[in-house]
Amino acid sequence: MLRKSYIFTFLKYTFKPKSQGEKMKKLIKFSLFAALAASFANAAVYEIDPAHSSVGFKIKHLSISKVSGNFGKFDAVIDYDKNAKELKTLEATIETASVNTQNEKRDEHLRSADFFNAAKFDKITYKMVKFEKESDTEGKVVGTLTMHGVTKPVVLKFELGGFTADKNGKEKIGFSLEGETKRKLFEIGLDTPEITLSDKVELEIEVEAKEK
């Protein structure tokens, strides 16, 4: 009993504020910690389901039609806060050599030094900097795209598809991302004139991910 009383006395002495200013500092620190803890508690981390996700693009050919393509190998870290209804983290990695336009000869050319130079720049990455919420299901992902050794800002339109549970009871999230960029910003295909291949590239991404 004496030992217990001593411990309580020690703790009381240790954490008892010595002044009103110190008391306020402790209160502010505690409030910040509580807010941070609540934020982490509400956010969920998801791992991407590649079988039900896609990273696609479209680019105009000869100024009259669009060629579609995609990257077959990719991964992402996704953190979504259901209470705040906003994306907290999005970091994606794409294997450059996995580019696929349904034409092997063209794909080999895209992997070459004329375009992506996949042997030297084997990864394409996208990292979210901030999320601008527009509604409970829509917003803008402001981030940076690193490709071909060049990093540029790219904004993607976010649209939440919704939530469900898989057969094992794990929660799944689905959302779409759309945006555009310019290949010449990343020094890709600089010798290819725009009359042959447009500078603008449309980005179309579909994500289905499972809670970890």
Regions found by a protein language model. Name each.
Residues 25-33:
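Sec-dependent signal peptide recognition
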Residues 43-212:
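Low-complexity, acidic/polar, glycine-enriched regions of mature
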Residues 3-23:
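Short, Lys/Arg-enriched N-terminal segments with co-localized hydrophobic residues
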Residues 32-35, 114:
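Generic secondary-structure transition motif, activating predominantly at the C-termini of alpha-helices
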Residues 34-42:
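Hydrophobic h-region of N-terminal signal peptides that target proteins for export
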Residues 1-2, 40:
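Intrinsically disordered, low-complexity Ser/Thr/Pro-rich tracts
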